Amino acid sequence: TTGDTYHRAINRLPGHCAGISWPIWMGILAYVPGTMGLGGIFGGAGQSLSFLGSLAGVEIDGVLCTGIIAIICSIILSTGSYKWLESAMLPLVVGFTLATLTCVVAMQFTEFAVSPSEIISGLKPDWTLFVAFAALALSAYGYTGTSSGDISAYTYWCIEKGYPTYIGGDRDDAGWEQRAKGWIKVLHNDVWLALIIVTCATIPYYILGAGVLNQMGIVPEGNDETISALSNIFTQTLGQWAVWIFSIGAFIILFSTVLSGAGAGGRPIPDYLIEMKLIERSNLALRKRIIRWYLGVLPLIAFLIYLFVPNFVILIM
């Protein structure tokens, strides 16, 4: 309602170190593992592209594919004009999600069918499994858009869209409070709706993994085997022809995640510098240049990380 950025508001919290609020310092510390995770997503996108190429009879090294994707993302993000790409990818991502839901339904008519009792038993807490796989499960769920970085990026997106201007800056206006409450209600509904959609879109992957991969005894290991092993959730439920749907959908989802993740991650960078008194908030031109240069370099850094640690599962964890 104030138009303030996320980090400017966070920096007002009590508990400062060297003049900066401790959540800001925590965010800076989290930058390294966050960038490593982005390198893992780049690696996954590269491996999915390599797998797609192999289906077409074109063998391309996964690392090379990752490098190509990093360069393409760097060019797209540095221009700042990728709305057309987001618009094109949205229906494809929705289509792949619907295909995954179809796989869950189709699975019930195969040897991999799961009973309601099995689903209920799977919802019961198992602390042994939690300790063993908590990091992987939480990190995987976090990359669906529920991490603190995504939450902060959402606020920047709202400001860039100009939504706070609908409320107005004059708090003495008789209708200001009513507009502010209405806007906050819209945000609440938006967040709840997003949470429901993300959860409903994520659960089918867990069900397919437990129902198909677990019963087949498949444990994906290594970059080359992981994408191929995961394709079984489609081929074993819909048929071998569905490997094309899986490979194309997996690439689109990972590529769109790379674009949105890197694009969102660039917005807070000038804000960090402002709160650390390194640049002036009023210098809008400099802030835009920083974002553009950062978004041009970030994909290349993520690729270098993957080059040194060529295992996207480990990086995402």
What is the role of each PLM region?
Residues T1, C158-I159, T165, I196-S228:
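Extracellular/periplasmic helix-exit of transmembrane alpha-helices
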Residues Q47-A56, I69-L92, C103-T110, I305-I316:
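Membrane-water interface regions at transmembrane-helix termini and the short interhelical loops
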Residues T5-A9, C158-L187, V219-A229, D271-N283:
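Juxtamembrane inter-helical linkers in multi-pass membrane proteins
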Residues V58-I68, W241, L273-L307:
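Loop-to-transmembrane helix boundary motifs in multi-pass membrane proteins
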Residues I20-A56, L254-I274:
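Hydrophobic transmembrane alpha-helices that form the core helical bundles
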Residues H16-P33, C65-I68, L129-Y141, C200, ...:
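Select transmembrane alpha-helical segments in multipass membrane proteins
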Residues T1-G19, L49-G53, M216-T237, P268-L273:
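Flexible loop linkers connecting adjacent transmembrane helices
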